[in-house]
């Protein structure tokens, strides 16, 4: 059976996972909802499903595809359905089920699967392979996919320089792995991307934009840094800081919400990182708890720069529809021009979630959530300070021109009374002790990563270099398309 995700099917092969589950109550009934992350190209969204919905899909598909031998965890007749170990085991089984669905075009293009994953929803149909403001610019005629993407760096690094130990994350183009460099025993997070998938989705520009942003991050303490990058004939490799305190999302799911001092500390470090990006004319555009990591001491580290927009000065705007539904600003939903203040809206949404446990306008129905973001007044419940209420109201202002940060950007956030007790100088110098210590056991501790990832087998293909003599023409063309991807820092810094 064919497993090619790039042939003449409706769209790119989706990537799916179940990062978490949550308990809900409705009309005095208690049930577990599983949060399914779906990625197709540069679009990404969440779908919330109960076990009964997985079971219904399974029963429909097993009759139509008996040879597939699909399976899901069995219904539990006796025992506690809300036992944490049972829910964890069931989530792993359901994750395996949906992973199998997206391996086969016959399955992931089936109407029941597409409906289950909401793949045909109009809100997921935008094609961000090009920015909207760039589509209107006429492009010179070209008959080749080969492009020069920057200066060539150090070509000597190779996959065999590393021992690849664990899968610690997944995306639509590849995986992130914990790797140990053989030369000095240092641990890194290595992001491995498939060139063929990147090319088929016309994403070279976004990959190189991410690389460019990463190169600038070494100057800021709360942004993940790129040590170097290299490529084989089939894959691209980013060698990044390994940050093992866990996603903010991971800790927030476990603790539901944070005390205000802890939320303030994280918000300040996030704001500092965003302020730095803005100072070098970069808008982040995709702030969410899943993209905010904690290091081994408990400091914030912002990661994943694939949706960053470069070259945006304080008065500039852009129009691309991108981001994650729960955190989209009103002007993005309306497809109106937006500016740096989109990041301050997202900061408000993340701060609100840290304090209250859910994003500010959250609803399981995404269309209704969009309507809430556009029209519903902000609901500020008791339990937080007046200055917290104030900054949430000002960051989550629906009119971007009146939003906190609209006039003087990061300076306005720094000067807000909510942060009055903080020394921003001490913060950037990491002199303020974090309010929470992840208590990692060492540089290779992965306890704060989801077992859905870490229990996966490390693919052998990421560990080897391809031989040019045996690759086909399309792979060689892919290699030409990424001229300039490889990067090495100055030699004195290479093995620090």
UniProtKB/Swiss-Prot annotation:
The keyword Ribonucleoprotein does not apply. GO terms for cellular component: cytoplasmic vesicle; early endosome; recycling endosome. GO terms for molecular function: ATP binding; molecular adaptor activity; phosphatidylinositol binding; potassium channel regulator activity; protein serine kinase activity; protein serine/threonine kinase activity. A motif (Nuclear localization signal) lies at residues 195-205. The keyword Mitochondrion does not apply. Residues 121-157 are annotated as: Disordered. Residues 139-151 have a biased composition (Polar residues). The modification Phosphothreonine is found at residue 320. ATP binds at residues 168-176, 191. Its main location: cytoplasm. InterPro entries: AGC-kinase_C, CISK_PX, Kinase-like_dom_sf, Pkinase_C, Prot_kinase_dom, Protein_kinase_ATP_BS, PX_dom, PX_dom_sf. Residues 420-496 form the AGC-kinase C-terminal domain. Activated by phosphorylation on Ser-486 by an unknown kinase (may be mTORC2 but not confirmed), transforming it into a substrate for PDPK1 which then phosphorylates it on Thr-320. One of its GO terms (biological process) is intracellular signal transduction. It catalyses: L-seryl-[protein] + ATP = O-phospho-L-seryl-[protein] + ADP + H(+); L-threonyl-[protein] + ATP = O-phospho-L-threonyl-[protein] + ADP + H(+). It is an enzyme of class 2 (transferase). The modification Phosphoserine is found at residues 126, 129, 486. SMART domains: PX, S_TK_X, S_TKc. Disulfide bonds: none annotated. Residues 12-124 form the PX domain. Keywords: ATP-binding, Cytoplasmic vesicle, Endosome, Kinase, Nucleotide-binding, Phosphoprotein, Serine/threonine-protein kinase, Transferase. The active site is at 286 (proton acceptor). Two specific sites, one in the kinase domain (Thr-320) and the other in the C-terminal regulatory region (Ser-486), need to be phosphorylated for its full activation. Serine/threonine-protein kinase which is involved in the regulation of a wide variety of ion channels, membrane transporters, cell growth, proliferation, survival and migration. Belongs to the protein kinase superfamily. AGC Ser/Thr protein kinase family. This is Serine/threonine-protein kinase Sgk3.
């Amino acid at each position: 059976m064919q497993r090619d995700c790039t042939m003449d099917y409706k769209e790119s092969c989706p990537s799916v996972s179940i990062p978490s589950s949550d308990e809900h109550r409705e009309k005095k009934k208690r049930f577990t909802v599983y949060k399914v992350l779906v990625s197709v190209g540069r679009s990404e969204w969440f779908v919330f499903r109960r076990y009964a919905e997985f079971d219904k899909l399974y029963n429909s598909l097993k009759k139509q595809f008996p040879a597939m031998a699909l399976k899901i965890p069995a219904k539990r007749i006796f025992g506690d359905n809300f036992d944490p170990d049972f829910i964890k085991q069931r989530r792993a089984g359901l994750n395996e089920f949906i992973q199998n669905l997206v391996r086969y075009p016959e399955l992931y293009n089936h109407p029941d699967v597409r409906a289950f994953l909401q793949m045909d929803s109009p809100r997921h149909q935008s094609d961000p392979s090009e920015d909207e403001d760039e589509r209107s610019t006429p492009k010179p005629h070209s008959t080749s996919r080969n492009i020069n993407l920057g200066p060539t760096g150090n070509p000597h690094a190779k996959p065999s320089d590393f021992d690849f130990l664990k899968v610690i994350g997944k995306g639509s183009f590849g995986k992130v792995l914990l790797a140990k460099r053989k030369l000095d025993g240092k641990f890194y997070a290595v992001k491995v991307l498939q060139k063929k998938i990147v090319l088929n989705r016309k994403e070279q520009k976004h990959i190189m934009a991410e690389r460019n942003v990463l190169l600038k991050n070494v100057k800021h303490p709360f942004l993940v840094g790129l040590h170097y990058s290299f490529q084989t004939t089939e894959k691209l490799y980013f060698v990044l800081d390994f940050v093992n305190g866990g996603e903010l999302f991971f800790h927030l799911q476990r603790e539901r919400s944070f005390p205000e001092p802890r939320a303030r500390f994280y918000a300040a470090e996030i704001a500092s990182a965003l302020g730095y990006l803005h100072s070098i004319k970069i808008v982040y555009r995709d702030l969410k708890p899943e993209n905010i990591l904690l290091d081994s001491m408990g400091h914030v580290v912002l990661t994943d720069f694939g949706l960053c927009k470069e070259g945006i000065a304080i008065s500039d705007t852009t129009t691309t529809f991108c981001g994650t539904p729960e955190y989209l600003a009103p002007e993005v939903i309306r497809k109106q021009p937006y500016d740096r203040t989109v990041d301050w809206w997202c900061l408000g949404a993340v701060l609100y979630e840290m304090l209250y446990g859910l994003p500010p306008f959250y609803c399981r129905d995404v269309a209704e959530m969009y309507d809430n973001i556009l029209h519903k007044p902000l609901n500020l419940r008791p339990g937080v300070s007046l200055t917290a209420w104030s900054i949430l109201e000002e960051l989550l202002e629906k009119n971007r021109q009146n939003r906190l940060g609209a006039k003087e950007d990061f300076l306005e956030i720094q000067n807000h009374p909510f942060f009055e007790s903080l020394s921003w100088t001490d913060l950037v110098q990491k002199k303020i002790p974090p309010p929470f210590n992840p208590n990692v056991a060492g540089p290779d501790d992965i306890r704060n990563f989801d077992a859905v990832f870490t229990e996966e087998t490390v693919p052998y293909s990421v560990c080897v270099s391809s031989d040019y003599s045996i690759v086909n023409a399309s792979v060689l063309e892919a290699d030409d398309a990424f001229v300039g991807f490889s990067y090495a820092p100055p030699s004195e810094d290479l093995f620090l």
